[in-house]
């Protein structure tokens, strides 16, 4: 296998290490050291995420869908290597990881289609009823708008 784990945190396009680390014993028994992010590194990652949010929020629905489909394409193109890395890191059988990979790419493509359809916007419009009693109803419009980056704490076991 040609993949060598970085053991670092990817922050704003750069692999960043800290002095604190932990060691994991993957299936091969060879120890791998992984960097533990400092509070400052987490802060820098949040700043980078905010900057990315600002620029990404200017992209079209088509561009966003294309990005998700491109990610799915890359995962599929690198499928064998991803499976090999996953089995060596976790000990899970290849069939399980291939299933997880298929689920992931399927969800990415589903989300891409959801974006293209515009369903996520959940636009609503309640027209004005000026003659409504006991009080008139104003023209009400609701549109979903992104507010910024989201931190996700997910499983890291594979």
Locate the predicted segments by residue.
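N-terminal Rossmann-like NAD(P)+-binding subdomain of aldehyde/semialdehyde dehydrogenases
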Residues: 1-138
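Conserved small-residue-rich beta-alpha loop and adjacent elements
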Residues: 125-158
